[in-house]
C-alpha cells in the first residue's frame, strides 16, 4: 500500500475519505447485508466512536440520486453489480444528524434542532422550481426554510411535520420514495436528561419521528443510529416493521469496529506490524454478536500517533473524546456489593448481570442494574458468555472490562471519587496525622483499615507484587499529603544507600518520619512484611538525609498491606 495515504482522524464523511486520498477499511458489505434483510425502520445501536456516522455517510453516498459512483470502485459492494444497478444512485436521501441538538434549556435545544432541520431542507432548494410540485407544496417547503432575524424559523406544527413533508416533496419530485438516515437519534434525549427537560424533548422527538417513520407512504426505509435503544413505548410507539440491531445481534456484527485482520493490515501498511499485540491489549475486546472488534477511533488515532512518533505509547483516545459520567454515577451510588463487583472487574474477572436493552433515560438511575445495562450498551463492559438463571428461561450475561483503555476509565473515576471522599473526612485524616506524629501504631492501623474498607480497590490480581506495593504506596502518599498542610513530604527520595518510600518533615525542625511500604502475599504474612520494611530502613540508612538536617527525633514505620487490611510497626 502507498504509505502516503492519510489517516482519517476525526473524518466521518465517506465521500471525502474516498475522494481525498484517506485510508479506508472497507465496510461496504454492510450495504449488501442491509438490502438483503431490511426493515422499514432499522436502528443500529453501538457505543460512541465505533464508525456509526461514517457508515451512515456511506449509505447516503450509495443510495442518493446523483451520487459519484466511482467512489465505490474497488470496494466489496462494487462486485455485486446486480445490486448496484438496482439501488446505487436511485433514491432521494435525507441524512440528518441529531448530535448537535443540545442546550442548557429546552428552548435552546429546540432552536438547535430547528436550525439543523432548516439547513438540511435548504439543501433541496431545487424543490422551489420543481414542476412536479403544486403551489401549496412549495409553500409548505418555504415554511421549513424561511429565515427570520438571521435564523431558520418554524412554527411548532411545521417542526413536527418537517421531515415527513420533505419526504413527500422529494418523492413527488423524483418519483421515487425517500430514504431517511437519522444519525445519533438519542443524543437530544441524553442531553435533555442531563439538563432537566427530558419530558419536553421526548414529546418533540416522538412527534417528529412518529410523523416521518409511521404510516408514511413516501418512505422507502429509514436507518437510525444511537448508543441506546430507547424504549419503544417512549419514542417509537406504533412504528411497524421496526428492526433493532444491537451489540448482541450477530447480523452486521463486523461492520461497526475493526476486526483482527483489518488492524493487522492497517499496522502492516504503515510499517507498524510489531505494534499489533499492544493495539490488541489496549483497544480490542469488544464482543459484538459473534465477533470481537476494536474501537476504530482508538486504532486510527493510535496508528496516526505512531506514524509521527514510532516510540509513542498507547493513549486513552476513546476516554478523552467524551465524558465518562456513567462510571462515576455507578460509583457514587455503589453499595458494598457493587463495590466488590467493580473491584472484580478491575482485577480482570467477570461479573454476571441481567441486561435490559430497552430503557428510557429517566429510568437509568432508578436502580443500579439499569446503570450496569447502560455501561454494557455504551461500551464500558462487554459480553464474554451467558449464564442461565435458575428456575427461569432468561439468561444473565457474563461481563468484563474490554481492554486496558476502558480499565483506565474506571481507575480514574475511582481515584477522583476517593479523593472527594477523603477530602470530606477531615476528622479521620486529622486523627491519622496525629497518630503518626505520636507513633500510635494501633490508631494508625485502625484508621487505615477504616479507609481501606471504604475504598474500591483498583488492583489487578494478575499484577506483580511490586505493582501492588506501588498501589498501596500511592494510596498512603495521597492520604498523607492531604493530612497536614504544614508537612513537607517526599516520595522515593534518594537517601543514604537507597531510596525510602516516604519521608515526612513535620513542623518541628528536630523531628522526622520515615515510612517503608510493603505488600504481603497473605494476611499471615503481614508481620513478616513489616519486619522486612524495618530492616530495609535500617540497613539502607534511610534516616541519613534527616540526620544531615539535624532532625534527630526520627520515627521509622514499616507498614504492610494485604487486600483491605494493614499492619503497622514503628521504632523511635
Mark where each language-model region is.
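P-loop NTPase motor core
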Residues: 10, 61-126
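Conserved P-loop NTPase mechanochemical-coupling segment
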Residues: 9-18, 108, 112-160, 188-194
